[in-house]
Amino acid sequence: MPNNQLSNATISNTINMSAWQGRTDPEDGELGMRWHQKVLPADQANEEGIMLLGFACDAGVARNKGRTGAYGAPIAIRRALANLAWHHQEPVYDGGDISCDDGNLELAQHRLGEDVCLALRQKHKVIVFGGGHEMAWGTFQGIGAYLLQKQEATESIKAPLNLSEEKTAEPNVKGTAIPTPRVGIINFDAHFDLRNPPSGPQASAGSSGTPFHQIARFCELQHWPFNYACLGLNRGSNTQALYEKADRLGVLYRDDTELTHRTIEQTQAALNTFIAECDYLYLTIDLDVFPACVAPGVSAPAARGVSLEIIEQLMEPILTAKTEQGDSKLLVADLAEYNPRFDIDNQTARLAARLTWTIARAIR
């Protein structure tokens, strides 16, 4: 999207702490704390921790001809998370929501990327609540900007950053090439979300079905490897063309029928190899990977899906992966496609909250 269109559009960015309410147990003192008593607004982030961001947007779902309603997901996930018991060491901050109120998806993704990049520069880990899976392109814009800035700082180059332009490989001041960052994208999802944008593979306007195509295009322009794993696919919801494209791109994928207790060891081995070959990780969970009986509140409910127990086992090596310096490889995790409009008794919100709780407890 041209810069003048970005600047003329309106996207709201607000921090509303009213969702953080719940039960209190004063008789238990500090050991009786719950999330709503511990989460702080981002302007009180005085030390490294976990930054929560929201992406209130389903414009990409609408473009992809899906069921809208994911706009209301971030606040609903916070409400479900608020009453969970606190078992964490790191502080957690709420950085507010990017709200796409006028259908300008490209600006919303750009603004989400800015917030993700800022949080990473402040040395926080990031968890994003969505919103349609178009959020993944916004999240990755933030990861990409952060890593490019790290590269440029190392190379002592002060040229302005432009994510839309091809980056040529340049040596640092000593003439030694800077290693290309290897970002592993791990997507638990019933869909590849590798579609070409409607106006062509090089177009910037996408949908909830195109984010990983857009990420692949970005990686191509930056001369980065595209390391993508998609686990939990519903073969009946992905065309042969998408499987062929995934093969061309070297995607590691598994269908939902392959993610069972009988076969999980093979998948774990492949995933461990994938993780070992990456410097950084980005975990994205589309809640439609779970069975509809577990996650009814999604844009595209799954007739079969993958059990929470299997997903949790596959998440473990992602959450515990460390760099050579002992830091978590995981930079950002996000939860996509929660649709409160179709939820039953907040069941899917509770699932999203439990996943958030698990991620937050493990990544530090």
UniProtKB/Swiss-Prot annotation:
Catalytic activity, EC: 3.5.3.8
Cystine bridges: none
Pfam family, one: Arginase
Catalytic reactions on record: N-formimidoyl-L-glutamate + H2O = formamide + L-glutamate
UniProt-annotated binding residues for Mn(2+) 1: 133, 189, 193, 286
GO terms of biological process kind: L-histidine catabolic process to glutamate and formamide; L-histidine catabolic process to glutamate and formate; putrescine biosynthetic process from arginine, via agmatine
InterPro entries on file: HutG (IPR005923), Ureohydrolase (IPR006035), Ureohydrolase_dom_sf (IPR023696), Ureohydrolase_Mn_BS (IPR020855)
Details of cofactor binding: Binds 2 manganese ions per subunit.
Keyword Cell cycle belongs to the record: no
Pathway: Amino-acid degradation; L-histidine degradation into L-glutamate; L-glutamate from N-formimidoyl-L-glutamate (hydrolase route): step 1/1
Entry superkingdom: Bacteria
Family: Belongs to the arginase family.
Protein name: Formimidoylglutamase
Lineage, highest ranks first: Bacteria, Pseudomonadati, Pseudomonadota, Gammaproteobacteria, Vibrionales
